[in-house]
Amino acid sequence: MQREAILLVFFSLLLLSSLSLSHKFSNGSSPEDEEEEEEKVNEDAGVIRRSMFPPDFIFGVSTSAYQIEGAYLEDGKGLSNWDVFTHVPGNTPNGENGDIADDHYHRYMEDIENMHKLGVDAYRFSIAWSRILPKGQFGEVNPSGIEFYNNVIDNLLLKGIEPYVTIQHYDVPQELEDRYGGWLSPQIQEDFVYYANICFKEFGDRVKNWITINEPNLISLMGYILGWFPPARCSPPFGNCSAGNSDIEPLIVVHNMLLSHAKAVHLYRKQYLAEQGGRIGVTVGPFHYEPYRDNGFSYQAVDRAYAFNFG
């Protein structure tokens, strides 16, 4: 009975819509007028249409390597800090991990086709550091990793989708964590630039938009203040990790990340920019603040909040 009532309402609305449309055209209005009126109605109702954006607005989707690739030990890939972290009981809900994830490593062609059907202009994805350099500078470049990302980039371009590539999105080769503590050591700056150079050299002829590090502020917060992300370091009152100092280590980590970013940007601009003509920057995890009251003190508080979180 409920279903019949719903169908009756639906067909009644459909009939009214048809009659209304017929009445409008019988009064001499053109299809162009109707389209403009429809857009105005949609805009008033809060409906977002592509036509409301400037012609050069870029519509895109994004992922990160650990979240979607899977194949965590296939074709020469090494362990990342996330591979190790998620295999420790209690670190994730129900022991979930990215061993398979969305299986993008094997199904990237399907994923690219789906993006093409969506009509997106750009796809931002990250390269798994441990798939390119399983042991950082302490091992060889993995040719299967290079081949995989070449295939992804080439097929994106064939579908008219611009690749936006993040060099590091939370994941670090576990080898570097074990050898010198990852982002806690200045040695990682050299490793990161070495890795970035390989990315520029192998993919830069087609990739014109680079992001060095994804959200360094959140890596610091989640991994070294709260201990919720690898390497799970923290101290009271923020958490009860087995090791870490939530007051000092985040500053060291951000310092090393910013210098790694700066050195990679310098390398790109010096050695690759003239030939490849790309752009390079960093992604910061945003927080938005509103003044509590409409007065100078509240606006100053907003400024302080932005300065504290973003520098």
Predicted regions and their residues:
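A short, flexible beta-alpha/helix-coil linker loop
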Residues: 129-134
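Classical eukaryotic N-terminal signal peptides for Sec-dependent ER targeting/secretion
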Residues: 1-12
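Aromatic-acidic/polar surface patches that form glycan- and anion
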Residues: 50, 97, 101-104, 108, ...
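Active-site region of glycoside hydrolase catalytic domains
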Residues: 3-5, 18-92, 135-138, 143-311
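Aromatic- and Gly/Pro-rich amphipathic surface segment
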Residues: 78-113
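Catalytic domains of carbohydrate-active enzymes, especially glycoside hydrolases
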Residues: 107-128, 162
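Short, acidic/polar
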Residues: 101-115, 188-199
